[in-house]
A protein has these predicted regions:
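Intrinsic-disorder-associated interaction segments
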Residues: 1-11, 15, 19-22, 32-36, ...
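Terminal, compositionally biased low-complexity regions
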Residues: 1-47, 52, 103, 229-238
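Polyanionic, low-complexity intrinsically disordered segments
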Residues: 2-13, 26, 161-175, 179-238
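A generic structural signal for solvent-exposed, polar alpha-helical segments
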Residues: 14, 31, 100, 136, ...
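A generic signature of intrinsically disordered, low-complexity regions enriched in glycine/proline
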Residues: 16, 27, 43-48, 96, ...
Length: 238
């Protein structure tokens, strides 16, 4: 069976491909707005070296007038929203497969047929379903797990903590899929899709390493101890 983290990396690679395609498109759009020639050296580095341009990372890559135009005309909105949907898909896949990994590990020696039947009956329809199931079966309180993260000035991705970030991404995905557009979270520049994607990569990496140590080795990392203290201080029994 494919490991959750390996599947995530596979999906992550696909999302990164869309990010790079959006980057190339963005460079053409910005060059047209500025009435400049396209920087083919930058495009070649994106295509051949798996790099991204500063348009994804910093607000000062755009002028105020450019930011206004991008928001009004929505040049990057549709492709940025698809990056957010794909990011959510990768995250959801990881959480489902990780749950199965931990459940199978903790039920080793039990009737395999019953274990698999139990897993087949579990249905994760929303973020709170993951929160409840991880807490019930593994005493993992997802809202208390926080990774250090920051975005750039001018980016609309400004969650106060990791749980708020996950909720933002989940809601944006639902709005895009069911209503055609993200209503509360604006996707105007490449930063608005890059930073949610980059956050999920960091969150999954941290979650996988720290909870694997706890579940498989009964070892508490520094980040796990911080998570535990945070949960207990909020009255959560873990």
């Amino acid at each position: 069976m494919i490991r959750a983290i390996d599947k995530f990396h596979e999906l992550d690679k696909g999302v990164m491909g869309v990010v790079r395609a959006a980057d190339v498109y963005a460079l053409h759009v910005i060059a047209k707005i500025r009435n400049q020639k396209i920087d083919m050296d930058v495009i070649n580095s994106i295509l051949s070296e798996n790099k991204i341009s500063g348009l994804n990372l910093v607000s000062y890559a755009y002028t105020k007038n450019e930011l206004k135009q991008l928001e009004e005309k929505g040049h990057f909105t549709e492709i940025g929203q698809q990056i957010i949907v794909a990011t959510h898909t990768a995250l959801e896949s990881y959480l489902i497969l990780k749950f199965r990994e931990y459940y199978r590990h903790l039920t080793l020696g039990n009737n395999e047929g019953i274990v698999e039947e139990t897993l087949s009956r579990l249905n994760f329809r929303c973020l709170n379903d993951f929160k409840d199931a991880y807490k019930k079966f593994f005493k993992i309180h997802i809202p208390s797990f926080d990774v250090s993260y920051h975005s750039s000035d001018g980016c609309n991705f400004e969650p106060e903590n990791s749980w708020e970030a996950l909720i933002l991404i989940y809601k944006a995905r639902n709005d895009i899929v069911h209503k055609g557009v993200s209503l509360d979270y604006k996707v105007s520049t490449l930063m608005d899709s890059w930073y949610p994607f980059d956050f999920v990569r960091r969150w999954v990496s941290g979650f996988d390493a720290n909870f694997d140590s706890h579940i498989y080795q009964n070892r508490e990392t520094r980040l796990y101890r911080e998570y535990k203290e945070r949960a207990i201080s909020n009255g959560i029994s873990i």
